[in-house]
Amino acid sequence: MTEELEGDEPGGDTDSDGTANLQEHESPLAEQEKSSGKDAKANAATNLGMAVLKAIAPLDLPTISPALLGIGQTAADIFGALDLPKLTPGIFGAATSSIITLMTAASLARSRPSDFETVEEPPTSYSSRLSSPGDYFADQEAIVESMEDLNQVIRRLTDKAQLVPLVWRGQQNADWALHSSLFRELAALKGVVPPQDNPVGVQPYPSEDDMVAAERAILRVARESWRFSQLTAMETIARLQHQGAPTRLLDVTRNPYIAAWFAVEASDEHDESDARLFALGTAPVPKTPEAESANTAYAALSTALTQSFEPFWHALDTTAKRQQLDWGTGSNRLVWVPPEYDPRIAAQNAAFVLDGVPMFTQRVSRYFKASDGHSWTKADLLASASIYARMYSTTRRPPANGASIAPSFSIRIRSSAKLEIRRMLERWFGYSRASIYPDFGGLSQHIKHAFRDIVAAGP
């Protein structure tokens, strides 16, 4: 449970139903109304955070589902009520710190501390089994050779994985890695050679510290040189992602057929290549009903944490802190649905997956083996994905695992099926470049891609 806050009496008042009584903590709000400017907001943020912590201290939160859900709402309310995106970084950092402490106190981490007590594995070379990321994903992949196959695989997978919330991502080439653009750019800067080039020797893939340092530099430029200083960290990063700048975000959709459209999208360069459709679990398979309730509460808290001016994960500067919030453990993938400031977001049912670079230790690595027992190296896994991606079969119900790693699923779409699937998606759902990219950027790309056909069709 939570530590006693300095100056606070142990425990706290609760009502007869076991919920926290927050009446005695209303004074910070009253004081805020009497004050003015950023100092008042700073005091309110700090006092409210402490009030919430004190109120929940007596509760055995991991066993009380309503309390867990209430904490998520409280966290969101704190951020919403104080108009926090307009606060200075220092003030917002204090409020964010309070919420991080709240999450830690609630003991919501799904991963086991013992799995990350050992020193993280050093960089490694590729194993002989990996000639491309596609080799890693192929071990458990489903094969789609027609629209009928696609329907069956999606229906079977969503039925088998009912207890796991899924998001979807389509990629035009089955041999591409599941990498964020920031991870990919940093890997190139650090001199990583992809497995397709058959390199010999250790591969220095980016660490979480590398990612954080790059993000800090990018945010500094955005706020100091371009003066985008009033946006939250997540909104800044999301807008940069939309404009093609490198970020740690992975574009996903909550609609499997939209993801399939991205996988089979017409492309002179990739039409002859197999495509890949990913289904990413955002939480582990729950081991108990209580764990399933915790998944819901964790999602609510995750939403609140994405509202900070500074990225909350920048404060997680040790392995222990990252494990406490399941950052880079594979046990939690934050899914952020951005505001609909862009027409593509609604059209694509879009969201972003957010997670830390995997923390590979010897104890965790044992969960990453091929179906024939082959052990994948750290380089193999990072060459394949910038987040934990433990693959499962689409034909069986995914079991819970000791490390509480969220499941991932892979579907290979044969190149010969791309045209049929593309035509059926347009006929059944109206998916086309015009509907998926309903803006001038999409129009420009379409004209560039289909210029000859457009001119040939005439006015």
Report each predicted region and the residues it spans.
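Catalytic-core elements of nucleic-acid end-processing and repair enzymes
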Residues: T2-E9, E26-E33, D39-P459
